[in-house]
Amino acid sequence: MSIKNLYKNLNDEMGSISKRRKNNNISFNKSTFDSHAMDALNTSFENYEDISLEGFESYINESASRTVIERNSLVPLKDYDAVHSLRNAFGKPPRDNEPRIGTHPEFKHLELDNRTDTGYVVTMFMDIIGSTKLGLSYSPSDVFLFKNNIITGAIETINAFDGHVHRIMGDAVMAFFRSRQNEQHDTLENSVIDAINCAAYFIEVMNEIVKPQIKEVADENIGIRIGIDLGETNYVLWGNYGIPGVNEVTATSFFVDIASKLQHKAPKNSIMLGQNLVEKLGLTVNDYLTYKLKDGQPDRYIIDFTSKNQSRLRYKQYLLNQSKYFSILPHGLKPSRIKVVISYSNDELGLVNRKDYFNCSSVIPKGKWVKFHATFCEEYGEHYESLKFKFRVVNNGLDASKKDNYDNHETEIIKKAYEKENGVFTAIHKEQTSYKGLQHMYISVISNDTVIEREIPCSIFIK
């Protein structure tokens, strides 16, 4: 399923809004709406007499006078299918509760008194950039609807990945990812993965839906920026700020503040990750991370501070390689005739504590056995006497880097025609989890030394 189909309502509404600009009676200079700096606007206006203050006021008033019935259409349609499909793709059970804003549900008790509590949190900040000139291209109601559709899509994606919307600040959203279950089982990484996957999907929405729609009718340089970081339990304090009636339960942490700074440093339609989060997952610059460039040089640090006593605080920032990472997520995988079911267990036979796994959905502890159950179905008219399944391991991270060639290896399994059932060949291969980080199993199908189905990735986070 494509992103456009996944977020069908958002795609349709963005298309409707963007095309309404064509019918506006006011004629603005097209160069006004390109990606140049805003100071070019005044120059553009000086060259055109048809842009009058009276005309612009009339344009504003026309939108403001819309009927109540018309204004009801400003409420975005929810993409329930997107939430459901995303949760299915990552093996998450249905989420019954409607999303709420404000205090995180696990800290509601702090609203009643002046106590504080500790608890880890993954904080995500997202904001819309480059939208200032939309008000010159569209009516205020369409600008509102345009921004609100983006905000609504972000909220639904956050909800799909078990996040909690804490604040909406104009055209920005602040969300928390955490759960008591992950805290109790020491699987904070799962909340980190949820936040990254959430952000990656919504960047893809901007790239595949919003950006193309708006570019059809105007040269708007619109996008979003996302910053994410992890604060572990002993470094995050939850408490009730304010006075009764004017109060908010929120998280206080260096890492919450850093997430906000990362968002401001992120390039358009990009995700910036903090050092603590990256180290927790075991990611490295060699796999799915890079550095933002500043004056042609890597901009490695979001904080680089030397105190009066000459002690130095340095905190790294990383840019997620969006296209590379999204390509291994369920909706980024290329169509393939190879189908794979992944599971893991405590023993090689798969008898003890067996669990299903979905690409990039959660962490698996070291020492577990992962089973890859691969199938390949012959098409009409095909008949293979034998097929070879190739299982190719590609490891990443500091743990694996200490081994020769990262301990990368291949295993080939040959299946004869008499072993297939109803035209379906099956091969099963098992590997033990050994190295922290994001590791991959690439599976392909070969006949007579010719690849008949290219590699598909099975990507697993190992704790």
Swiss-Prot record:
Q: Does the keyword Disulfide bond apply?
A: no
EC no.? 4.6.1.6
Signal peptide span: none
User: Which parts of this chain are annotated as the region AGS-C domain?
Assistant: 334-454
The primary site where this protein sits is cytoplasm
Cofactor needs: Mn(2+)
Q: Name one GO molecular function term.
A: adenylate cyclase activity
Put simply, this protein is called: Cytidylate cyclase
Organism expressing this protein natively: Escherichia coli
